[in-house]
């Protein structure tokens, strides 16, 4: 059965699109037929992070409006087998997204036997975000360990619980997960960031992953590659752990404690 997962956040700049790309890529690496959809109409950043911006011919809105078939709009990833991207439109109005149109596209993807449909939602509560949430079976709420980000995530959780198709039909609610990004144990220790425990206590949803602050993320993004492809990076490893947990595997959380310096590093102040 196809799992529809929305990756969402209360505010921008928390690494939501990076997370969507990494999770989709990781699932495909595990042999799952996966498509990631960009719901951010007008901005379209997912194709840049996935390195396929020059291959966009048709987009999500073209399919909704009947200007293209789903097979024409889907972009097959060149680096990862089983992975497809459905880009957003850069030029169309956000109101071009409709409930019936999104449902039509999702049903077509389900009929194509995708294992996972990852919906990369815009931040906040605009049309794209509401529609990405509405049809989801599961939601990954992406947040930084900062008070403002966590507060906005709490608002998104309210929307997830009340504005979904599942809540309308009074069936099993959307399964919610917390993804904590840009986590820096040193800053947590100094009191400059909330701890993982603090965020869990505030939001009260299960945590699926903790992604450390890592310069490799920006480098990968600029190269048009998903960070999960860089397994030598801490962030890439943490995203892979997250994917494994999403598939039901148990993995200890890494990168949540300050790295202990060796004697020589302490001696030379490095």
UniProtKB/Swiss-Prot annotation:
Pfam families: AAA_31. ATPase required for the correct placement of the division site. Cell division inhibitors MinC and MinD act in concert to form an inhibitor capable of blocking formation of the polar Z ring septums. Rapidly oscillates between the poles of the cell to destabilize FtsZ filaments that have formed before they mature into polar Z rings. It comes from the Bacteria. Keywords: ATP-binding, Cell cycle, Cell division, Cell membrane, Membrane, Nucleotide-binding, Septation. It is a peripheral membrane protein. Belongs to the ParA family. MinD subfamily. It comes from Buchnera aphidicola subsp. Schizaphis graminum (strain Sg). InterPro entries: AAA_dom (IPR025669), MinD (IPR010223), MinD_FleN (IPR025501), P-loop_NTPase (IPR027417), ParA/MinD_ATPase (IPR050625). This is Septum site-determining protein MinD. It is found in: Cell membrane. ATP binds at residues 11-18. Its main location: membrane.
């Amino acid at each position: 059965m196809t799992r529809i997962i929305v990756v969402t956040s209360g505010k921008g700049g928390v690494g939501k699109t990076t997370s969507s790309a990494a999770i989709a890529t990781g699932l495909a690496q595990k042999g799952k037929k996966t498509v990631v959809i960009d719901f951010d109409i007008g901005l379209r950043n997912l194709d840049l992070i996935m390195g396929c911006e020059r291959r966009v011919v048709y987009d999500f809105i073209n399919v909704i409006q009947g200007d293209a078939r789903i097979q024409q709009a889907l972009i097959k990833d060149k680096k990862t087998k089983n992975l497809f991207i459905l880009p957003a439109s850069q030029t169309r109005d956000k109101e071009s997204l409709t409930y019936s149109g999104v449902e039509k596209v999702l049903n077509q993807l389900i009929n194509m036997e995708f294992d996972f449909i990852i919906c990369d939602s815009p931040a906040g509560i605009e049309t794209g975000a509401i529609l990405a949430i509405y049809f989801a079976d599961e939601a990954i709420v992406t947040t930084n360990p900062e008070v403002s980000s966590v507060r906005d995530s709490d608002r998104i959780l309210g929307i997830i619980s009340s504005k979904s198709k599942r809540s309308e039909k009074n069936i099993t609610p959307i399964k919610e997960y917390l993804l904590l990004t840009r986590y820096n144990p040193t800053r947590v220790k100094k009191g400059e960031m909330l701890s993982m425990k603090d965020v869990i206590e505030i939001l009260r949803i299960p945590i699926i992953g903790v992604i450390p602050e890592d310069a490799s993320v920006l480098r990968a993004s600029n190269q048009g590659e998903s960070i999960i492809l860089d397994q030598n990076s801490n962030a890439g490893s943490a995203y892979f752990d997250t994917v494994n947990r999403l598939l039901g595997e148990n993995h200890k959380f890494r990168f949540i404690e300050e790295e202990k310096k060796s004697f020589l590093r302490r001696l030379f102040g490095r």
